[in-house]
Amino acid sequence: MANSRILNDTAIDGQIEETTAWKDFLSLIKIGIVNSNLITTFTGMWLALHISGLSFLGNINTVLLTLIGSSLIIAGSCAINNWYDRDIDHLMERTKVRPTVTGKIQPSQALWSGILLVALGLIMLLMTTVMAAVIGFIGVFTYVVLYTMWTKRRYTINTVVGSVSGAVPPLIGWTAVEGNIGVVAWVLFMILFIWQIPHFLALAIKKTEDYRAANIPMLPVVYGFEVTKRQIIVWVACLMPLPFFLGSLGLPIVILGLLLNIGWLILGLMGFRSKNIMKWATQMFVYSLNYMTIYFVAMVVLTLF
């Protein structure tokens, strides 16, 4: 009986360790970022199939290769980012529990896991089209080298540079089907590129003290909240004309885009009268998340019929 109990306890401990290790891995690859980028990748691919008149089920191999491949390169890039930033992540409340900081994942494990994931992802994208793999590589290079290693710790423009890499998933999805980049694909890229800047600036306001502690030159740290609020308004306003370039997808998508943009702009302007900037920044951040999810999912749903 005693031996049986010991064996059961040992088995439970092993299961807990496996669960913890899996959670640490998901934290390393920033699974939330991977999942959100799956939405935009799928939308780009779906619209390419829709406009080209191609069957979704008839191209299921391309769909799976693209979704898995893009997920792998994003996961790998995030792992490399965690490896590189481990020396500053312990200074910020938001990142101090990352497994590369706590020691649950060794630096070499994080680095080589990231490299392996990126390599596998690029191979899978190459099995769709060369262009998809090239764009995937550009996204990885921009995020890992231009953003993480170069601009993040040096320039306030880091947010703009990082937004380039975050905008390539729909291009990957599109080119995996088409092999070239159409007008709609470029509009999706521009929407995501511009969207990310007010999204991350709102987050930067919320986490200003974290970034200041880590000596990361985010806009609100260097120039203050008022300048950051004006920049947010400018970038949200830049989204206004983009839905008009999606007319080929139908009037409902154009109208939805305009309504989302107007709502975001109004909320942004309210920041100049808000007495609680942290509450306003949180509202802007949450709105941005809903904006991206609603608009990109709607593009798929509204083109089903």
From Swiss-Prot:
The keyword Magnesium does not apply. Pathway: Porphyrin-containing compound metabolism; heme O biosynthesis; heme O from protoheme: step 1/1. It is found in: Cell membrane. Its main location: membrane. GO terms for cellular component: plasma membrane. The chain crosses the membrane at residues 38-58, 60-80, 115-135, 157-177, 181-201, 227-247, 249-269, 285-305. It is a multi-pass membrane protein. CDD domains: PT_UbiA_Cox10. InterPro entries: Protohaem_IX_farnesylTrfase, UbiA_prenyltransferase, UbiA_prenylTrfase_CS, UbiA_sf. GO terms for biological process: heme O biosynthetic process. Its EC number is 2.5.1.141. Keywords: Cell membrane, Heme biosynthesis, Membrane, Transferase, Transmembrane, Transmembrane helix. Converts heme B (protoheme IX) to heme O by substitution of the vinyl group on carbon 2 of heme B porphyrin ring with a hydroxyethyl farnesyl side group. Interacts with CtaA. Belongs to the UbiA prenyltransferase family. Protoheme IX farnesyltransferase subfamily. Carbon 2 of the heme B porphyrin ring is defined according to the Fischer nomenclature. This is Protoheme IX farnesyltransferase 2. The gene is ctaB2.
